[in-house]
């Protein structure tokens, strides 16, 4: 309603943020990364206006500006809405985490978004500083000019630990060709999807050396992660209470943003050591005495990282899993992405799985072809009934893997039972 009555509301309200605006965007991890940056700023006593509820299109940004007061802004922004929001808020810093194939029926291929982002970076060069993922060729390339020199005001982050490389490239490999010349990239190693160490044999474009890099990473499954992080001024140790390499990337982005925002690395690392997961981003909630670990899945790359994390938890009689696959507009109507996610990773490690959501039968079929024992696969489309059945049957922890709108349904359900807040904080 606000934007219909006052289309310039974001720019007008944003003008009050005299201490600057930071924008975070990515296909995967923007909510978590923005939350991490908020925690880093809070360690300095700074409380930015922040759309922490996860509503990341123009109306979510406008609502945060209308309801909160402060002199500094921190906003996660949907990938497609980034150019418009950036034009209205004139950010001092933009953090770009990754681009993965996601909601093809809404956005088209990721190269379209990469082109839009390239135009944004070109237009804002010299006015905005950028924190970019060196390991994503689509993102890293934004930080170079036409002569392949690093643009002024660019800080790169990435992973420099070969021990964490995948044994082979995944199906979810979205950036195969050089944006400069179209030649296929050569990968020395890949960490998450197409994130890794790459180069183009034709034109010489290659992964830039990151300014903020994780050099020694120890993954402890759901118990969290430890890493040594190399910074321009030395090394620090990071203990993160969140699992997976994807959260290492999120933390590196937050540390790099902290540097740009004037927060001492040691203080930023300490803040990240106490960070809480956003709802559905590796949060555990007690449901009827059963711990339910909720891990959002919405595209092949993100799902693969969740599956890698769960494989570290496997043992004994196997894992109890609840997967809710929806095909509503916010999920994307096209659910063919499930065939590119490596569900085969857990085929030998599952005790029981219950498929829910509007496309539950398709999910069950995908698991069958992934080699999950059919006698362990059940289908109940209703979110509430299926969750209750899965909880009742689980002897221990239940792993809940919902897509985006299924996560919203789950959040509403748990909130109605007094088990979770309706909006994450």
Task: Please state what every model-predicted region is.
Residues 69, 90, 126, 150, ...:
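Short loop/turn motifs at secondary-structure junctions
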Residues 49, 155, 239, 293, ...:
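General small-molecule cofactor/ligand-binding pocket signal
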Residues 175, 182, 192-207, 256-264, ...:
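ATP-dependent carboxylate-amine ligase
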């Amino acid at each position: 309603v606000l934007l219909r009555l006052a289309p310039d509301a974001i720019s007008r309200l944003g003008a009050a943020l005299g201490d600057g605006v930071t924008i975070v965007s990515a296909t995967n991890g923007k909510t978590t990364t923005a939350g991490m940056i908020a925690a880093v700023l809070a360690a300095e006593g700074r409380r930015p206006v922040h759309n922490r509820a996860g509503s990341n299109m123009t109306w979510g940004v406008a609502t945060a500006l209308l309801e909160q007061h402060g002199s500094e802004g921190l906003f996660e922004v949907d990938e497609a809405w980034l150019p418009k929001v950036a034009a209205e808020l004139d950010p001092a810093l933009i953090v770009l985490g990754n681009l993965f194939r996601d909601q093809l029926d809404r956005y088209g291929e990721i190269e379209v978004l990469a082109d839009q982002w390239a135009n944004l970076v070109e237009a804002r060069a010299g006015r905005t500083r950028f924190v970019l993922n060196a390991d994503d060729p689509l993102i890293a390339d934004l930080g170079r000019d036409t002569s392949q020199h690093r643009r002024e005001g660019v800080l790169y982050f990435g992973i420099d630990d070969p021990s964490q490389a995948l044994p082979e490239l995944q199906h979810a490999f979205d950036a195969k060709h050089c944006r400069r010349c179209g030649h296929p990239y050569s990968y020395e190693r890949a960490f998450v999807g197409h994130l890794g160490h790459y180069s183009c044999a034709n034109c010489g474009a290659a992964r830039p050396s990151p300014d903020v890099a994780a050099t020694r990473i120890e993954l402890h499954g759901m118990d969290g992660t430890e890493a040594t992080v190399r910074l321009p001024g030395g090394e620090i140790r990071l203990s993160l209470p969140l699992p997976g390499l994807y959260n290492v990337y999120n933390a590196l982005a937050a540390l790099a943003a902290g540097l740009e925002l004037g927060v001492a690395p040691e203080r930023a690392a300490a803040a990240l050591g106490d960070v809480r997961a956003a709802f559905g981003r590796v949060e555990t909630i007690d449901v009827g005495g059963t711990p339910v670990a909720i891990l959002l899945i919405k595209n092949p790359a993100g799902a693969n990282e969740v599956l890698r994390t769960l494989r570290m938890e496997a043992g004994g009689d196997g894992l109890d899993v609840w997967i809710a696959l929806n095909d509503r507009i916010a999920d994307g109507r096209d659910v063919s992405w499930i065939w590119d996610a490596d569900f085969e990773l857990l085929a030998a490690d599952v005790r029981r799985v219950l498929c829910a959501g509007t496309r539950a039968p398709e999910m069950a079929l995908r698991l069958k072809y992934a080699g999950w024992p059919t006698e362990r696969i059940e289908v109940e489309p209703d979110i509430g009934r299926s969750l209750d059945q899965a909880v009742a049957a689980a002897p221990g922890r239940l792993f809940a893997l919902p897509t985006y709108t299924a996560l919203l349904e789950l959040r509403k359900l748990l909130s109605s039972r007094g088990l979770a807040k309706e909006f994450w904080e």
